[in-house]
Amino acid sequence: MIIDAHVHLWKAQTGRREVDGMDRPVRSLTDGLSDFGGEIRQMMPPYMLTGENSPEMLIANMNYAGVNGAVIMGETMDGRQDEYFLAAKRKYPDRLKICAFFDDHEPYTLEGFDGIKICACKLKDPDLLKLFPVFKAARDAGKFVAIELLDGAAQTEELREIAKELPDLMIAIGHFGMVTRPDWQEQIRLARLPNVYVESGGITWLFNEEFYPYPSAVRAIREAAELCGMHKLMWGSDYPRTMVEITYKMSFDFIIKSSELTDEEKRLFLFENARCFYGFDNLPKLPVIPNML
């Protein structure tokens, strides 16, 4: 079985992007395109025609690739999609875990969600300690926190302090600590704490110049495992943005085919760690359907 720890959905993008110190709107167009703060970008594959990034399309991709479960999270550029996530969870309760979205001190709710996503790298005020009440509320409600940090060690000591103060709060650091940036290992070292894990959403984006089968990404996973243990690392795809370059299956196939990881390490990374962290307990077995080739 496989669990994807980092997936995005949206009805229509209503978010923002900072350009020259000013917030510019991000809006869905057609044919997988988006207006990315004044620039037209291929945000998703062109066959996603309407601008909607739907749970039905995600589940179809998961079924085809053999991915049993996924964790849905928001992003500043996508805007708040809470109601859309809740509807997706109602439709696919055994396949999806969903995150509420914390957006720079705007009102938020945890009700109905499994966790909360904090884009700490995009906060106007990067001081994480000022968000301690948000972390504590998640702990008190039995929710996890998914967080993306500024590059390197810019916010690691603050997160370390919070994680130690709230040892019962489960925290997942995204984007594999921004693995291609200087001092990325400082974020990985946080996973030495018992309640902190790391997920690899976006790792194929970060190593896109090298491209499939991403040998440097595999070496980075190996290095991270030496820093915190393979039992603290989880796979994530960053669907659908990474799918403009590769197929969904390719986003984990390079792990399965790697000779640098053992079968047990692959099982932990692709499934078992995320099953334990997110609490997936009723995932369906998926049939293997051959391609028409």
Predicted regions and their residues:
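A metal-dependent hydrolase metal-coordination microenvironment
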Residues: 46-106
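Glycine-rich phosphate-binding "P-loop"
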Residues: 39-48, 72-73, 115-125
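Conserved, mostly hydrophobic/aromatic
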Residues: 6, 62, 85, 138, ...
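Active-site beta-loop-alpha junctions enriched in small/polar residues
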Residues: 8-10, 75-76, 101-105, 119-121, ...
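Hydrophobic faces of well-ordered beta-strands that scaffold small-molecule active sites
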Residues: 3-7, 70-72, 98-100, 114-118, ...
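Mid-to-C-terminal alpha-helical segments outside catalytic/metal-binding sites
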Residues: 1-5, 12-60, 64, 69, ...
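Catalytic pocket-lining loop regions of alpha/beta-barrel enzymes
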Residues: 123-234, 276, 282-293
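Generic structural signal for well-ordered alpha-helices
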Residues: 58-59, 82-89, 106-110, 135, ...
